[in-house]
Amino acid sequence: MTQVYNFSAGPAMLPVEVLRRAEQELRNWHGLGTSVMEISHRSKEFMQVAEEAEKDLRDLMQIPANYKVLFCHGGARAQFAAVPLNLLGDSRSADYIDGGYWAHSAVKEAQKYCTPNVIDVTTHDNGVTGIAPMKQWKLSDNAAYVHYCPNETIDGLAINEEPDFGNKVVVADYSSSILSRPIDVSRYGVIYAGAQKNIGPAGLTVVIVREDLLGKARTELPSILDYKVLAENDSMFNTPPTFAWYLSGLVFKWLKEQGGLGEMGKRNQAKAELLYGAIDRTDFYRNQVATANRSWMNVPFQMIDPSLDKLFLSEAEAQGLQALKGHRVAGGMRASIYNAMPIEGVKALTDFMAEFERRHG
């Protein structure tokens, strides 16, 4: 059987060790004679799963004690509404950094609840897109918070700086880059991330929120999106996505076994450098993102002759290189190389790219 590497942007590849363990435990979890999917979320057995998952995530990210960790539904799109309704209070304005597709999507949702101060930080130079340094961002004085997306999956744009905005409340959508390298959680008021890219399967959303920001929700906020309600109920205000929570917990343990986020950062940088190097080495392929803002997680690329795209994708698929088609709004190709993608998968892709160019260049 051909070795398969899944380059999907999400739902994304999971560590094979995690899948094997889940397979082994699927029908008889911990000797109970049933699946973890079938037990009560309030049972002592599942409570242990939940507690261990939170502890391991706190250890991995070094989350300070004055932050709550919530395991929620709804993905990042639910958080696009939850953030303003939890944090605006009496304010009518928040700063929204617009650096790509998902940042702009957050703006559109926030417009239902406030008047966002939209700050376009993209730069354009001879067809190459980048992001202006944070020191050039024109933040307002009276914003309730500053929202940005550190990694844009579609555009392949990354903001690699961490925020240093004094006392401003910083909110970050880390859906596609959480756990890919160490970050300083204390620089943020809220971090949120859909699980389906770098945490676990779709259906779970992780929210990390500083305790002093709880209890400011607007009255019209649905209880299921209220950070204070979720925190007071240990993320079990309603039945949570238990299987996704369990699998994410296995991923956290796998990350610790691999050496933690420092080690993952080294691996992810090496994978990205290998793939960008293959693209930059030739005129046959191109990436139109400024070097300083190239994503380690999502690498879009185009061929000089777009008529070859379909052939490239079909031949790649035949060799076990799956899900390389670019997003519908961007076209071309995109390789998502999250934590679970081994460097062998990236080497297989770059070898295929070189061979394809040899035959069609």
From Swiss-Prot:
Keywords: Amino-acid biosynthesis, Aminotransferase, Cytoplasm, Pyridoxal phosphate, Pyridoxine biosynthesis, Serine biosynthesis, Transferase. The modification N6-(pyridoxal phosphate)lysine is found at K197. Its main location: cytoplasm. It is found in: Cytoplasm. Binds 1 pyridoxal phosphate per subunit. It comes from the Bacteria. GO terms for cellular component: cytoplasm. SUPFAM superfamilies: PLP-dependent transferases. GO terms for molecular function: O-phospho-L-serine:2-oxoglutarate aminotransferase activity; pyridoxal phosphate binding. This is Phosphoserine aminotransferase. It comes from Yersinia enterocolitica serotype O:8 / biotype 1B (strain NCTC 13174 / 8081). The lineage of its organism: Bacteria, Pseudomonadati, Pseudomonadota, Gammaproteobacteria, Enterobacterales. The gene is serC.
